[in-house]
Amino acid sequence: MIIKSLELKNYRNYDELSMNFASGTNLLYGDNAQGKTNILESIYLSATTKSHRGNKDRELIKFEENEAHIRIHFEKQGIDHHLDMHLKKNKAKGVAIDRIPIRRSSDLLGQIPVILFSPEDLKIVKSGPSERRKFLDIELSQMERLYLYQLTNYNKILVQRNNLLKQIRFQNNLIETLEAWDIQLVKYGSEVIKYREKFIKHLGKVCQKIHNKLTGGKEKILLEYDRDVGYDSYLTELAKKRQKDLKSVSYTHLRAHETGAY
């Protein structure tokens, strides 16, 4: 995949911008606060639907303007494509590839595979597990469409289970339906864990090779996933925590998506 050109209109500090990229490495340079990071952010946003800075869409639109537009011309498997993204202050963003609307973010992820390294990424090692989970989810969602499917379903079921825990306080007979949600939660949660473990193993091997070069083989680096839960053990542990879940009103204490890499 190659990005050939980028056009911006009313994005951040840009009234209009049109730039072509050369094959190979492209270097952006200039004075501070001139918009270099904004260019990278616009590409990342178009590929993932999210800003790496965590900004809301309205904050990406140039001051005193109501909407912004990003267009990317890219080549994939020898075929040219155009991605258009419209940002509006009071509406959800619109995305289309070759004029065909993209309705779900899951259909966009992986179309333009990107890896962004910014100062914010130091949170992966400096902050808690949530930042590492976020990194895993972004990378895996671009690489494995099935992972995104499993994660999306897991999160939906988790919300439903937590809502059920709240309802059980007022309708105790609903407790009989909890096991059905547990089975679904474990089904998708176990798959999420498997994908993450596989990714961490592969990433660990790559990191070890790079670290060997940097240290002359004198030091070792180890990446581990902190939980090894199979389907049966996950279901058993979830059942053990059921009373605790019920007492907390609407919270599932054993959550597959909150395991992490260390």
Which residue ranges define each predicted feature?
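Amphipathic alpha-helical domain-onset/packing element
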Residues: 196-225, 230-250
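An accessory alpha-helical subdomain
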Residues: 123-215
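Short beta-strand segments
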Residues: 15-19, 79-83, 221
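Pre-Walker A-like glycine/lysine-rich segment at the N-terminus of P-loop NTPase domains
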Residues: 1-45
